[in-house]
């Protein structure tokens, strides 16, 4: 940026701060989950989303729903699901009423790993937020995140 470049608008500054906060939180959680459970943030998120879907053992979603839930393209989601399926943490099966549909289901091993990883995720999230709260640029965003009362 040179002296003649226009200053970012408050909206752009806010977006940059939000992006910075997200990146720092995700990186901190990623390191913790990888070190203790050999899971990426995306893998953890997918197991978490599927664990909240209830249809008998574990949970299931169609692949498009999985992609939307973990905010990935369908091709990236397929690769993510394949990695977890190879580790026996997920299974895929055809939809019984629409043979074109493929469901993804979390396994008992996936639920067990998720239960072990959840405290690590929560602790890392708290640590990342506490660290970010010490940054004057990020502190207001941290307060907003902490004040949210989103239903589970």
Describe the predicted segments one by one.
Residues 1-39, 87-89, 139:
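N-terminal leader segment of winged-helix/HTH proteins
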Residues 2, 82-139:
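Charged, amphipathic alpha-helical coiled-coil/dimerization segments
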Residues 20, 24, 28, 32, ...:
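Solvent-exposed, charged/polar functional surfaces in cytosolic regulatory/catalytic domains
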Residues 27-73:
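N-terminal helix-turn-helix DNA-binding core of bacterial DNA-binding proteins
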Residues 48, 115, 142:
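A cross-family signal for key residues in well-ordered alpha-helices
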Residues 138-152:
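Exposed, interaction-prone assembly regions rather than primary DNA-binding/catalytic cores
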């Amino acid at each position: 940026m040179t002296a003649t470049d226009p200053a970012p608008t408050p909206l752009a500054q806010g977006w940059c701060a939000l992006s910075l906060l997200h990146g720092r939180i995700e990186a901190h959680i990623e390191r913790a989950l990888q070190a203790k459970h050999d899971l990426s943030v995306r893998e953890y998120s997918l197991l978490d989303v599927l664990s909240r879907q209830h249809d008998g053992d574990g949970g299931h979603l169609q692949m498009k729903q999985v992609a939307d839930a973990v905010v990935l393209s369908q091709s990236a989601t397929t690769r993510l699901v394949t990695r977890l399926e190879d580790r026996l943490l997920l299974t895929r099966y055809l939809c019984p009423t629409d043979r074109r549909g493929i469901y993804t289901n979390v396994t008992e091993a996936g639920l067990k790993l998720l239960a072990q990883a959840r405290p690590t995720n929560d602790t890392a999230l708290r640590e990342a937020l506490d660290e970010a709260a010490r940054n004057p640029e990020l502190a207001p965003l941290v307060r907003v995140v902490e004040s949210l009362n989103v239903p589970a």
